[in-house]
Amino acid sequence: MAIDPHPPEGRLAEDRRLGAGRSDWSSWPTYEAAALGLPGSWWYPVMWSSQLGRKPVAEQLLGEQVVFVREAGRVFALNDRCPHRGVPLSLGTKEFPGTITCPYHGWTYDLDNGVLRAVITDGPDSPICGKVAVRTYPVAERLGLIWVFMGDGDGDPPPVDDAIPRELLEHDFAMGGNIETRHGGWRFGAENGYDEGHAKYLHRNSLWRLFRLMPTWTRTRVVPTDDGWITRVQTEVHWEADFPGLGTWSGRRWWKRGATSKMLGASPSKAAKADPAIASLDVPGNQSIRLPGLLRIVHSRFIHYEWYVPVDEDRYKYVQIMVEFKAGLAAQMFKLRYLLLFRWLFHGQFSAQDEWMVNVMDAPPERLYRPDVSITAWRRLCEQAPRNGQAVRKG
């Protein structure tokens, strides 16, 4: 079908009204190029510590194949490819202490430094030993998770504690969580998590919010806070809206708990019944995000965190944890509530609504609107990644 090179003015006006959207993310070049993760060096949570036993575990992270091995209680991570013929080392075995052996020809690598120590099929005097090595990655165990340091540069990485929210280092807490691989790419996952607009509509009928009223629309600003976070602060909260020529829309239902003036943009850390650990955060709003992709949602009694760890250009590891700052019997009661309730309602059905949208999202092109101030603030933060990465410390 031929295309009219001179469309009528009416059609041009219609095209301008609808908008063609952005052709790319060229306003955020670092972000646009970050399909496999932001530049710089970062600690990422990968799996539960309990998932790594005697057998090697293969993972793909930031487009790289990595094998995790536990030896004498310590975790190691190596590039999951034997340099000989490209066979995954994760298919191999531990024939000698402190090593992993390729299943094909018996090439055996040191877990600590990746150096080829022996070639079983070439005898003890194999001349290639010591001349070949696979890449190794720093690893650590914290919060019941295995963390890996993915980045470039020589020298020792910064402490893994630098990547963990300080409140989790300063207080006792009970925790529940979920890790799964999702489609859509880590950037869409992070944008969905920090997006101001979607929760009020997409999640209005979720079981997690079944008895709690959601606003219809809000006004929001984004402010930088401590430790590299940017925080959403609601300046206006509206529970219904009258749309001219259409009618009134409201999420009010007889069974939903009504809103009060104290709920209008209030900081959960300043709530009268806020947990002391949460009150000490003194955050201006309940939702924050920081590099390289860690979301924190603060409630008055608990905090939810989620990491978006790139797997490849289309997939990411979605790591969710929920914590209450409790000890003893109260901690055990939280764990029970998590297993019986929160795991299914929040980390399950509620989160599955987000997965649905992220999986079908197709942008750019895109046309942003006022609530997307949260998304553009996040993209601007990502542009600082080359300067703000968890840089390798020399010496």
Task: Label each residue range with its predicted role.
Residues 40, 133, 140-142, 302, ...:
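A short, structural micro-pattern
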Residues 32-40:
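Non-catalytic accessory segments flanking enzyme active sites
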Residues 20-23, 38, 102, 224, ...:
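Alpha-helical structural elements
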Residues 2-20, 25-31, 47-174:
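Rieske [2Fe-2S] iron-sulfur-binding domain
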Residues 3-7, 74, 80, 154-395:
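C-terminal catalytic domain of Rieske-type non-heme iron oxygenases
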